[in-house]
Design a protein with these regions (language model features):
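Fold-level signature of zinc-dependent metallopeptidase catalytic domains
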Residues: 96-249
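Propeptide (latency) domains of metzincin metalloproteases
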Residues: 2-154, 186, 193
Length: 249
């Protein structure tokens, strides 16, 4: 059975799989069987039911895996290919999110708008260090879940149109899009899934003059640790990370 975008995002159907079709980089529609794979603690997901994440297995290309995020700001996808094929992405192309672009991982996107790809790389690098510190093994066959305290600078929030906590959903939607892709990599390579903690939005900031992160970027590690210790508490998360709009994280 095929369902449209509204059906896929229906929280009442989140425990069931659904078959959807999305275009690949060659312009051919491919089918995937998808199911919900939230990046949020259940309490956080309950607060933001309109922001969701899904995983899917390929039906047209049996070896492919889909990661899909959805919010009122639109959808983003990442398709993992096997046999050395490049991964593929779908992202909004137009400002109003009515036009989307499909591209392969090795292609330079040129005129496409700013995307979270840089954030993906930064998050992966930071988490890889933490994973190594914790001695997590990738080959034991058990999917592990860790609690992520994700903070963002005011500049990051402002980039996505959020200038106050009333617009927190704009920021969380952007973070969710990055987390969806990053979790795809970690689930595939390390059997590891990261869930945003319930109060991660407490360390989202909106005013550059008052947020706790100052330049140079080399200050951020210590400032992030101090912020998470003060606001979140060290017993309440496993990994802490920061997004900034200037290329740091």
């Amino acid at each position: 059975k095929k369902r449209d975008q509204e059906d896929v995002s229906d929280p009442n159907a989140r425990s069931h799989s659904t078959i959807i079709s999305i275009p690949n980089a060659e312009g051919v529609l491919e089918q995937f069987e998808v199911y919900e794979a939230s990046n949020f603690d259940p309490a956080l997901q309950a607060r933001f039911p309109e922001i969701r994440a899904y995983s899917g297995k390929g039906l047209s290309d049996k070896g492919s895996m889909l990661k899909l995020s959805i919010s009122p700001q639109g959808i983003q996808t990442m398709v993992f290919r096997n046999n050395g094929k490049p991964n593929e992405y779908i992202e909004p192309y137009s400002q109003d999110h009515t036009v989307y672009a499909v591209f392969k991982s090795q292609r330079v996107k040129g005129g496409l708008p700013w995307t979270c790809s840089t954030q993906d790389q930064q998050l992966a690098a930071g988490l890889n260090n933490r994973v190594n510190e914790l001695g997590i093994e990738a080959d034991n066959g058990v999917l592990k879940t860790m609690r992520l305290a994700q903070s963002v600078t005011a500049e990051y929030s402002n980039f996505f149109g959020a200038t106050s906590s009333a617009q927190v959903a704009l920021v969380l939607a952007a973070v969710n899009a990055t987390m969806t892709r990053t979790n795809g990599c970690y689930e595939k390579d390390l059997a590891l899934h990261l869930n945003l903690i319930p109060n991660t939005t407490d360390v989202f900031y909106y005013n550059p003059a008052t947020d706790p992160y100052t330049f140079p970027i080399s200050n951020w590690n210590a400032q992030l640790q101090a912020t998470l210790t003060s606001v979140i508490g060290e017993a309440n998360y496993d990994i802490g990370h920061l997004f900034g709009a200037s290329g740091g994280g």
